[in-house]
Amino acid sequence: MNVEAAKREHRAIDILLPLKVAVPEVVARERHALLMKRIDGNLLSEYSELPDPETVLREILRNVRTSYLEGGIINADLSEYNVLFDGRRIWVIDWPQAVEKTHPNSLFLLERDVMNILRFFRRKFRIESNPSAASLYVRGMSDTLEIVSA
């Protein structure tokens, strides 16, 4: 990570933490490195089953929505490799590539983040969600999100 990416990640987390977005807490930053508070979770990609995959998906999308609507921040690299889960709760990690919603490609990046997560849940847990409806939800154009187990 370079110095600018570390600053960008630190800034994003500083904006999102007070909004109750599930992000790791920064303990310290020195030039290009961030030290985060320890999280006892595993990458979502490592799970072959979840106790309640629909709830986990809803929680991820709720965090994406809050990040976008209240924080004005888009992760821009969201996938199953950037979500930690401890069996009870999630954390969205890896924010050095985050962009503000005023970025010219912000909607494309937001849609890509949503599609990456929906694709993973469909493939791994057979959970279906309408991509258009999920997009409307995270953009604040709908208050409901329909998720169906296949």
Per-segment meaning from a language model:
Residues 1, 48-49, 106:
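Flexible beta-alpha connector loops of hexameric P-loop NTPases
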Residues 1-42:
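Conserved ATP-binding subdomain of kinase catalytic cores across diverse folds
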Residues 52-63:
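Conserved alphaE helix
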